[in-house]
Structure formats: structure tokens, C-alpha cells
A protein has these predicted regions:
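...with weaker cross-activation on analogous glycine-rich loops/strands in unrelated enzymes
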Residues: 1-64
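A short, polar/proline- and glycine-enriched secondary-structure boundary/capping micro-motif
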Residues: 63-71
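Low-complexity, Gly/Ser/Thr/Pro-rich intrinsically disordered linker/tail segments
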Residues: 71-95
Length: 95
């Protein structure tokens, strides 16, 4: 499928995402490629309360099911002086 760059707008994503979509983050660790996509999860859908869920791995916790909150930062690495570059959600694709 085609990659769709997306802002971390939960309301808009709730209307757009479908089960099985791939969710992409950049800069969850120091990238060695362009574009700097460093993490992928699979969108599972919404529960009756409207929360969005995804499956994949997060660090050393292994594979699991996690709440998808698009504005939540994921991972980081030292960047410049005392600054850290934080991983952020950047888009999705339909396989």
C-alpha cells in the first residue's frame, strides 16, 4: 500500500485507520537510513470506549498489545548537547 503521512490527530485517525494498517514512527533510536522510520506497529481497531489499539513490540517488553495514542512519544536518543530527539508517529499504510 501507499504510505500516508499523518499528523498525530487522534480524532481524524479514528475515522481513517482500518484494522491491519501499519503505523510508522521515526527517530525511536538513532536512524541509519533515510527516511528515518525506525518502528512499525499494526493497528488493531477501537474498543467500545473508543480507545485505539495496536500490536507490536516496544523495547525489551516484547510483542504485545498497546493503546495507540498518536501524540505519545516513543523512544529517544541523544542528539545535540543535552537535547534528546524523541520518536514520534509519522503516518500509516495499508498493506
Amino acid at each position: 500500500g501507499k504510505f500516508q503521512r499523518a499528523k498525530p490527530d487522534a480524532y481524524r485517525l479514528m475515522k481513517t485507520l482500518r484494522r491491519g494498517d501499519l503505523l510508522f514512527w521515526e527517530h525511536t533510536y538513532r536512524p541509519v537510513r533515510k527516511p528515518p522510520i525506525t518502528h512499525v506497529m499494526v493497528y488493531l481497531g477501537r474498543d467500545p470506549q473508543g480507545r485505539m489499539w495496536m500490536a507490536g513490540s516496544q523495547g525489551s517488553r516484547g510483542v504485545g498489545i498497546y493503546e495507540f495514542r498518536p501524540k505519545m512519544k516513543m523512544g529517544s536518543y541523544p542528539w545535540f548537547l543535552w537535547f534528546r530527539r524523541e520518536g514520534k508517529f509519522i503516518g500509516y499504510a495499508r498493506p
